[in-house]
Regions:
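Conserved catalytic core of the tyrosine transesterase superfamily
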Residues: 1-212
């Protein structure tokens, strides 16, 4: 202020690097918590089959909620076991595990035709009125199953995305491959998950080592 107003000749703050803001590590679910969460939808009616397919797909691919609800039926290639995800920047091809393929097949063949209001509807996931699922609608679904599972962590759609990345890293996946699947433009966005794993190891050490 003093320099800008002309009270002093030099700016003493010039060249001083701004303080680094510590990046908060994302919250993730353990593998057991994910399994419990994915078990919550009951495949006894249309809603249960749809919700099960959505949650399996979200964890199988790590896509964003905006990408999930934007998926069209033509973005799936279930025989080959992958989905095509088109973001604003580029297209990604992401593989699916068998359980996600099965959940999607059950939904598409047996449930989606009952839900869509218009046979020309292209949306993969629709609400109970037959229209494309909204972010708010999916958020409510996530919260419902969090409460049903009794998981104390605050689960959001992004929690499954974070968990997807960390679990792949824990099991030896290449960081660049994870970056590609997540659609990160910068590898530094993906590297944050390595810090999560380091923190987990430190917690395990502190709890288990007799001299910690």
């Amino acid at each position: 202020y003093l320099y800008r107003e002309g009270y002093i000749d030099a700016n003493p703050a010039r060249g001083v690097a701004p303080a680094k803001v510590e990046r908060k590590l994302p919250q993730i679910l353990t593998s057991k918590e994910v399994e419990l969460f994915l078990e919550q939808p009951e495949c006894t009616d249309a809603k249960g089959y749809r919700d099960h397919a959505m949650l399996e797909l979200l964890y199988a691919t790590g896509i964003r909620v905006s990408e999930l609800i934007a998926l069209d039926i033509g973005d799936l290639n279930l025989p080959a076991g992958f989905i095509r995800c088109s973001s604003s920047k580029k297209e990604r091809i992401i593989p699916l595990y068998h359980g996600a393929v099965k959940a999607l097949q059950d939904y598409i063949k047996g449930v989606r035709p009952q839900l869509i209001a218009d046979t020309e509807e292209t949306a993969l996931f629709v609400n109970m009125n037959g229209e494309r699922m909204s972010r708010q609608g999916f958020w409510k679904i996530i919260k419902h199953y969090q409460e049903k599972a009794g998981i104390q962590k605050d689960i959001t759609p992004h929690t499954l995305r974070h968990s997807f990345a960390v679990h792949l890293l824990e099991n030896g996946a290449d960081l660049r491959a994870i970056q590609e699947m997540l659609g990160h433009a910068d590898i530094s966005s993906t590297q944050i998950y390595t810090h999560v794993i380091k923190n987990q190891l430190k917690d395990v050490y502190q709890k288990a080592h007799p001299r910690a």
